[in-house]
Every structure is written in C-alpha cells, then in structure tokens.
Amino acid sequence: MTDPNGPKDIPEQSAEAAEPVVSKPYIMPDDPEPDAVELLAKEAAEARDKMLRTLAEMENLRKRTTREVADARIYGVTAFARDVLEIADNLQRALDAVPAEARANAEPGLKALIDGVELTERSLINALEKNGVKKFDPSGQKFDPNFQQAMYEVPDASVPAGTVVQVVQAGFMLGERVLRPALVGVSKGGAKAAPAAAANGESNSAA
C-alpha cells in the first residue's frame, strides 16, 4: 500500500530547458540601406534636373520655330520677288532706250507714256521694299564677290585695283541674303590696297 504522504516523483527536466538562453549579438550589414531623407533628396534633385532639361529643350524649340516662321515670312517671296525684278528691269530698259534729246522734245502723248513707265517702275521697286527687298549700288566700293558679279575690267589708275567703277545693273538684298548680285565693272591697273596687317607692320617699323 502506497503512502499518500510519501515523496512524489518529480519529472525530469529536458536538457534543452536546462540550457541557458543566450541572445545573439546584432551584426550591422556591410551595405546599409540609404537614409530615407537622402533618398528623397536624390530623387528630388533628379526630377529637378529633368525638368530643367525639358524647359531648356522647349525654349530651344520655341526659338527655332520663331526663327523658321520669320525666315518663311521673309524668304517665302524669293521667287516672286525675282519675277517682279525682271519686270522692273524691262521697264528700266525701255526708259534707257529713249534718248535724252527725244525726252526733252517729246510730244505730250509720248511724254505722258514715259512718265507712266517711270511711275510704274518706281511703284514696283517700292512694293519690293515693303516686302524686305532692298536695292544696293556698290559704286566706289571694293569688289566683293559675295554681293557683286564682275562683268569686265576697266583700266583706271586713279583708283585702287579691284574697285567697282561702273554698275551695269544694281543689286538687291532680301533680308540678309543676296536676291540678285550687282553686275559691275571693276578697275585694273591702279595700286592695290595694302593689307591691314602689312600696313600696321610698316607703321611700327617706321616708329
């Protein structure tokens, strides 16, 4: 018979429960995550850079479009202006064909016709000027192949060689472009103008 007051069996504790619990130390990662504030600042800087580039591209596009529209407005009449110049040239040739004496002694009917042709020629030139076409006369200037076309040479020792001494046909500009070069006669035989660099060198030597 078992004694109820006797010693009771105590269950054995497991080996795992008997081991002490030791917390592992926290190890920092080699490449920590960037700070949230720094990340937002970087994204904001990138967005601002993209915005500035977009604004710059839009401004360049606006300027280019404005320039192209202006060029189209100015130079879009090039072909028409050349045709009108041809008409004005023919009117001028008709006037030049009338001798000065015949003009002075012209009957009223012929004089009225001459005056009408002159008025028409001037009206055409004025209409061209209103549309950006300007007449230029290079008489006395140094020959420039960008604006003039030499037709012949004229012996003239009184002016430097390469000077425009005669203008056969006036030139015309459309905006900043040559619509038609002037047809000119250029002097030859005179002293050539010294280059600026050479002239400066001689002056310094004399000093």
From Swiss-Prot:
Q: Where in the cell is it found?
A: Cytoplasm
Q: Which domain of life is it from?
A: Bacteria
Gene Ontology molecular function terms on file = adenyl-nucleotide exchange factor activity; protein homodimerization activity; protein-folding chaperone binding; unfolded protein binding
- Biological-process GO terms, alphabetical: protein folding
Q: What ranges does the record give for the region Disordered, renumbered to this chain?
A: 1-33
Q: What cystine linkages occur within this chain? A: none
Q: Where is the signal peptide?
A: none
Q: Does the keyword Cell membrane apply?
A: no
Q: Gene Ontology cellular component? A: cytoplasm
**InterPro entries xref list:** GrpE, GrpE_coiled_coil, GrpE_head
Query: Is Oxidoreductase set as a keyword in this record?
Result: no
Family per UniProt? Belongs to the GrpE family.
Matching NCBIfam families, A to Z? PRK14141.1
Q: What does this protein do?
A: Participates actively in the response to hyperosmotic and heat shock by preventing the aggregation of stress-denatured proteins, in association with DnaK and GrpE. It is the nucleotide exchange factor for DnaK and may function as a thermosensor. Unfolded proteins bind initially to DnaJ; upon interaction with the DnaJ-bound protein, DnaK hydrolyzes its bound ATP, resulting in the formation of a stable complex. GrpE releases ADP from DnaK; ATP binding to DnaK triggers the release of the substrate protein, thus completing the reaction cycle.
Share what the entry says about its subunit structure, partners included: Homodimer.
Name the record gives this protein:
Protein GrpE
Native organism is: Rhodopseudomonas palustris (strain BisA53)
